[in-house]
């Protein structure tokens, strides 16, 4: 950090840091708070910003007010991103909970997203195990464990086998 930067008020330094963090990708409010509170790596090692709790609150409020920080937008984008990577609804819910998103906001976004979880689970199975799907019990159990680990619900997993039999 340069000498002129260290003389800037803590609020201005925090705001600059928040905008830089949010310019890379969307964050939840809790993630942003955690990153702002973490020490900055400077040329001479970690450096703390001497900011008050009021400075942090003002920065968060400014980010909300100017559209840089929006938990509902973050949740929608996070769900879309993780589902494209093949993760199921249970895992996505758990990850959002870890990021400080309320259960109500998560459930609202999950209802609003237009994702066919059963089709997504089937795509994951065919990508990993190929067509046709195995009929041997031990292979079915292996696939079930894989999908449960990826965060799919048991009803979606069972639908794969029901639809496969048709």
Swiss-Prot record:
Major location (coarse): cytoplasm
InterPro entries recorded? RecX_HTH_1st, RecX_HTH_2nd, RecX_HTH_3rd, Regulatory_RecX, WH-like_DNA-bd_sf
Q: Which UniProt keywords apply?
A: Cytoplasm
* Keyword check for Transcription: no
Would I find Cytoplasm among this entry's keywords?
Answer: yes
Gene Ontology biological process terms from the UniProt entry: regulation of DNA repair
Q: Name one Pfam family in it.
A: RecX_HTH2
Any one Gene Ontology cellular component term annotated for this protein: cytoplasm
Q: Where in the cell is it found?
A: Cytoplasm
* Superkingdom field: Bacteria
NCBIfam families associated with the record: PRK00117.1-1
The text of the family note is:
Belongs to the RecX family.
Biological function: Modulates RecA activity.
**Protein name from the UniProt record:** Regulatory protein RecX
Species for this entry:
Escherichia coli (strain SE11)
């Amino acid at each position: 950090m340069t000498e002129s930067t260290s003389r800037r008020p803590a609020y201005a330094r925090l705001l600059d840091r928040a905008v830089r963090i949010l310019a890379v990708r969307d964050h939840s409010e809790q993630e942003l708070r955690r990153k702002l509170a973490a020490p900055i790596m400077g040329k001479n090692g970690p450096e703390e910003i001497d900011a008050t709790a009021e400075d942090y609150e003002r920065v968060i409020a400014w980010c909300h007010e100017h559209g840089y920080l929006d938990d509902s937008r973050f949740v929608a984008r996070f769900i879309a991103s993780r589902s494209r990577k093949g993760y199921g609804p249970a895992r996505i819910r758990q990850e959002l909970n870890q990021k400080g998103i309320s259960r109500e906001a998560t459930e609202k976004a999950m209802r609003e997203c237009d994702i066919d979880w059963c089709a997504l689970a089937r795509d994951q199975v065919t990508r990993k195990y190929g067509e046709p799907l195995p009929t041997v019990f031990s292979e079915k159990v292996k696939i079930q464990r894989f999908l449960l680990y990826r965060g799919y619900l048991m009803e979606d997993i069972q639908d794969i086998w029901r639809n496969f039999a048709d």
